[in-house]
């Protein structure tokens, strides 16, 4: 049975909503008057939550969350893997299996639009500093390979309208509204990106369908 069309006023589903980028997505959405459903593995403390947001506890690797997606117009995935020696060696399959389960739930509920966080470094970037290429990239290899596999998964999915946001090195600093958005390659001097600027861009990608 074909799903009923969903209006632009319908809520957005944000996964990984309790993380740094996820929280900034919620703040930007509320500021713009956009309704959101915030999905998070471990719910933030009440004092850390964004006002006027519906929070739902969800383990994307194990839970059935299709019913909670009903009526949403799009999905924003701010799922991410915290870096540590153990996750660098053997990262949990959050980008691959987690995204696959998001896509399955979207298919079951008639949602076709998703924006995810990947990384600029899944592709060679001529403008990045030498120290990053020599130290950080090797340490992040397994996580970056999983991000690349996630993008391949999205590319193969039928009927899916997807965008992978590929930020540079993320910083926990205030919003500037000056993010430089390009295709494939980082712009010169744009090695670093703020969580809040990434969040605003991801929200724009959904709202403008870009």
Predicted stretch roles:
Residues 73-74, 112-116, 163:
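Conserved catalytic-site loops of classical short-chain dehydrogenases/reductases
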Residues 12, 38, 44-101, 105-108, ...:
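NAD(P)H-binding glycine-rich loop region in Rossmannoid oxidoreductase-like domains
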Residues 40, 118, 166-169:
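Conserved SDR Rossmann-fold cofactor-binding beta-strand/turn motif
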Residues 146, 165, 189-203:
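Substrate-positioning beta->alpha
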Residues 174-179, 205-210:
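Glycine/proline-rich active-site loop of Rossmann-fold NAD(P)-dependent oxidoreductases
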Residues 11, 18, 35-37, 85-86, ...:
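Conserved Rossmann-fold NAD(P)-dependent oxidoreductase catalytic core, especially the SDR/UDP-sugar
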Residues 10-32:
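N-terminal Rossmann NAD(P)H-binding glycine-rich loop of SDR-like oxidoreductase domains
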Residues 151-173:
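Conserved beta-loop-beta element that borders a ligand/cofactor-binding pocket
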């Amino acid at each position: 049975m074909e799903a009923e069309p969903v209006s632009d006023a319908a809520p957005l589903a944000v996964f990984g909503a309790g993380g740094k980028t996820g929280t900034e997505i919620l703040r930007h959405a509320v500021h713009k008057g956009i309704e959101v459903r915030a999905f998070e593995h471990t719910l933030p403390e009440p004092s850390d939550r964004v006002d006027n947001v519906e929070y739902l506890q969800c383990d994307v690797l194990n839970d059935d969350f299709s019913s909670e997606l009903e009526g949403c117009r799009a999905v924003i995935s701010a799922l991410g893997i915290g870096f540590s020696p153990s996750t660098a060696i053997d990262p949990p399959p959050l980008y691959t299996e987690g995204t696959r389960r998001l896509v399955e739930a979207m298919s079951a509920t008639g949602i076709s639009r998703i924006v995810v966080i990947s990384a600029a470094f899944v592709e060679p970037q001529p403008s990045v500093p030498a120290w990053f290429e020599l130290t950080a990239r090797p340490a992040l290899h397994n996580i970056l390979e999983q991000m690349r596999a996630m993008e391949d998964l999205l590319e193969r999915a039928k009927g899916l309208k997807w965008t992978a946001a590929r930020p540079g090195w993320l910083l926990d600093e205030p919003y500037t509204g000056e993010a430089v958005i390009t295709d494939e390659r980082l712009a010169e001097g744009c090695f670093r990106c703020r969580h809040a600027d990434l969040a605003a861009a991801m929200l724009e990608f959904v709202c403008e369908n870009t």
